Amino acid sequence: MVGMSRIILNNLFFFRCVVAVFSAHSLVISGAVHAGVQISQSPLHGGGDVPGNLAIVASIEFPTVISVANLADTYTPGVRYVGYFDSNKCYKYHYSSRELDRYFYPVASPRPQANYGCNTTGGVWAGNFLNWAATQTIDPFRSALTGGYRVRDTANETILEKAVMDRAYPGNFPRRTIEGLALTTSVPAQWLRFRMRIDGLGNRMRFTQFPGLSTDPLNTEGQPYDPSRHPLNSNDRGVYEVSVRVKVCDASVGLESNCVAYPSGFYKPEGLVQEYSKRVRYSVFSYKNDDYYLDDGGVLRARQKFVGPKTYYPEQGEKTNPHAEWHPRTGVLYDNPNPEDAKATTHRVGRTIGNSGVINYLNKFSQMETGKNTKGFDPVSELYYTAYRYFKRLGNVPEYSVLTGSVNEKYQQADAFPVITDWDDPIRYACQSNVVLGIGDTHTNFDKNLPGNTNTTGEPVKPQAVRNDRSIDVVKRMAQIFQMEGMRQQDAMTSALAPSFNFLVPGAGNNSAYIAALAYDAHTKDMRPDLEGDQLLTTHWVDVVEGGDYKIPISTNQYWLAAKYGGFQVPAGYDPDKTVNPLSEATWWTNGEYVNGDTKAKRADNFYIAADAEKMVASLKHAFSRIVAEIKGAGTGLSSNSARLETGAVTYQAQFFSGTWRGDLIAYHVDKVTGALTPFWNANFPAWEQRVIKFANATTLQDFTKKNLGQTALASASAQQINYLRGDRSQEGNVPGKLRIRSGIMGDIVNSQPLYVGAPNGRLYTTANFTGASAYAAFAAQQANRVPVVYVGANDGMLHAFDANTGKEIFAFVPRAAMPKLLEYTDQNYGHQYYVDGELTAADIYDTKLGWRSVLVGTLGRGGKGLFALDVTDPSNIRLLWDKTSADIGGLGNTLSKPMIAQTSDGTWSVLLGNGPNSTADNAQLIVMNLLTGHAAQVPVSKTSNNGLSGVFPWSSQSNGITDRVYAGDLLGTLWRFTFSDNAWKVAPLFTATYQGKAQPISATPLGAIERSTGRMWIFFGTGRALSSHDMDNKEVQSWYGLIDQGTTIPGRTRLSQVQIVDEGVVNGYAVRTVSDPKNIGTDGWYMDLISPKSGKQGERMIVSNMFRGAALIGTTRIPDNSDICKLSGSGFVMAINPFTGGRLGQWFFDLNTGGGSGGALNGNPVSGVGVSSAPNSPVFTGNIMQIGADDGTVTSLKTPSSGGLNINRVSWREILRP
């Protein structure tokens, strides 16, 4: 394991180059807005405004509709039950001679008691009781998704109606009785008992007092309950019925929590579909309403679309939606928002179809009076396959959507809604996330008629379209999953071919788990080769747990399998065709929860239980929060704990998800033979109360709690807000008074690259002679067993420290400069902000009083003007050195580069950094800080405004590890040389980068080396910047430079030799380029204009630092592309050239031969650069494997030579850090 010892080798006396631990990591993303240099407050990668696709797959047969939602057969006062009624309201019943006008309505008085009961005199009913008594499973599903089925929906009035109970099946909805306190506080009856029935009564509830003699009164027709005529006194032997409808969103008596205000002045109940309507496009799939068991598949009910009054396509902006599903002023739902689809089905049926749309279908399936009950068979795998085909653009299966029989029978099969056969393409953007949210019970039937299956028991002739689909073999995929679940290969295949998976009963059953095979295939293999990148499908599923059947062991639940294998975090380099080993738990089980409390049944992250109404609502809300988090995913760059490809080598990847701005940190084992990555942990956290979170209070660290923050910028925060920042999620919600809903407690990680700090290397400094060098070996021995830690900054306002072995957070720190705007993070209307977004560095330094110490220095980057230092010698007892803001250091701006730790000739251990843009003076300055005291000196380089100094490169000209020279560029294109002599810093320009007279900004840290054969000092850097959207539109030419420092200012390009990009092409599927091979080197070095020989001037730029790798200088470029909304940061190249000529290498560097060997030549010349389709970050080398992390979170791995013969001192940190 590579530890802290490798981090500080930059100070070894026999290396002239003093470099940072980790290569610079700059994304085309940014932070604060200032009058000087504009810096965007959100990532500029692209795709952030692209809407996601959510297909709702409703496996609806009658148990899902008619089963009881609130499972407890005994009503318990004080327990809250879920349904259309407000548990915190009391109701009266409105009677009318017209049945459609009968409903419950809330009253202002009386108010409910503490146990949700009411004073029931005067005809009052308790809303909580009515939820328990009358709610069917599908009601809370509808309520959570759409706000509920509106049977009356006018501008000023909304009445909801419960689901139709179309069967007299008391086994699905038991007949219930209440008495005692439950009765007296729930219903307006002076009875000893209150007996009720729901089953078989449509939208009504029947109730009576007496059980009867030979005939149960509940089996006789009841009379409509009229509170003015039926006092329900003690001797009342009547049988009554109420229509279970409820008036909602009446502001005069108090609004329910899901009521949304409209410009009309009234309110409408809404659900998750409306809430996320600006960010998600929806479609719906279901079955035809046909009870014939040989009817296969599913049908498209509503095609993919926005459902709200506006569309939000990023390239168009906000526009009026021609297929809006509700009125923008009143919120009234439209019956037929997609008349074209309704008309097409009308033509096929011969009877008018007057309903369409996503919300309408979700509210009205099984509600329409077609004369037919809800279907009784559910071939769920075939239904899922229908959605699978939709996203793969394979087209409708005609046999699935055929309507047969009489006009009335066709109408019933259509369920009075469109059956869409002319499918469109649901994927509008290559970077869209595609998600399925399904609901159903596990007692499925006859769903095996799919590609690859030959067991046709209970199945009709396989449709031709299904036979033609060779993209998947469900039997092989299912056998593979069974192997991953622990079965032997032979047993797995036998199980995959079995006549039934978990439901084999006479006249039904013969089901499969092929839904899991389909979900796994769509989640791990590109569905659309015709589009750029991988188009994948993520599956979430809600199991309604029919009859309390949880399917234990849990691996016998097909929905659990589908959610696990269709929702796990796919590791980089994962091969879905060859993998048979179990998935790492870190990829699919991060919630720590179990199904029904069974510790052997771990709840997959995308699997939700709806065994009762309360759980269903919570499950759906959780599912949507995860879905939105997945909709816009991206990742930052990579880091490594080792330069060697050996056992224990680990790569760390930071990620962000722009749906809810959640972050994650993932650790991957690196295969020592192939370099393949296998995840073994995700960032995980203690309970929020137990987290160790600190902030700086004067010279010490204090707990980040409400009581300690009174003298900070967070003094006005509430305890709930501070607890939220600590990770408490109990106060999250969408109603007034609640805090923003998150899908995880860590904020997004964009520009802060993970920093690994392990144990020191005792072999360092064995020949050094500076103060303290002789004591280093003892310090290293003392610290040999300390816990390795990965540090990273996140945009939740914290530096996080994770145990590198487990991923568990052990410490977090909130810098003062992050506090002023941190409460915005808790706001429901939060728009992305940067907080702790800067780079980190760490080193071992010598303190003459305390000896050797390990220290970490961090910046806020785009998040603010701040800088902090911590003593991390003991990870269990991290201590404060200092925490500074621009109020302490006037020249400090948005520091966008890595701070450097170096020892200067006066014996001081210092922090060196460029001040960055937007300082008070708005100019470029070198900041030099005493690392132990925090005292800062500022060295201005010019008075020119709209400028800032970028990353610094320290250098030891005497080869003794003592820094006496620093190189840094600024945003106006000047490369500066700072020289330390006579205890003072002197500054002079080395070169000003220009193209045709226009300055080229330098935003990356330069790199230096000595050319051994000549002794000449070289400095390498590229130009360009990416701080705002304006920068992304800029197509000006940027360049790559190699300059010789001969002690004087280089007057211009005339004394530099020109290198050109001369050829571009494709080798083994990789975009590649070669550069020229100049024979004569300019007096002062070389330059290369980043101009494509085929595409011309594209604005290609170099905004991350160069690095050395063996015989090569490595540079990473980016080519913005504002024509592609999915990747505004564009693409780019990782290039490898001769550092001292700027030309191509004499031998191959990139191994592009997928079958082994080099394969690294284009038209006979060694390849100089390999293209990456998403903008690349600096590569990480582990052994001879180069891993390139891109803005979209993908990782490209390439082999490179295992060693190089470049005749220079060892200056690459990845070489220096070897023991």
Swiss-Prot record:
Segments crossing the lipid bilayer: none
Keywords recorded for this protein, A-Z: Calcium, Fimbrium, Fimbrium biogenesis, Metal-binding, Signal
Endpoints of the signal sequence: 1-35
A Pfam family the protein falls into: T4P_PilY1
GO terms for MF: metal ion binding
Triggers of expression: Expression is not affected by calcium.
Subcellular location: Fimbrium
Cellular component annotations (GO), alphabetically ordered: pilus
Annotated binding of Ca(2+), by residue: Q958, N960, I962, D964
Main location: other
Region called Disordered, residue ranges: 212-234
Lineage: superkingdom: Bacteria
Functional note: One of the three PilY1 homologs of X.fastidiosa, which are involved in bacterial twitching motility as component of the filamentous type IV pili (T4P).
Family: Belongs to the PilY1 family.
Protein name: Type IV pilus biogenesis factor PilY1 homolog PD_0502
Organism classification: Bacteria, Pseudomonadati, Pseudomonadota, Gammaproteobacteria, Lysobacterales
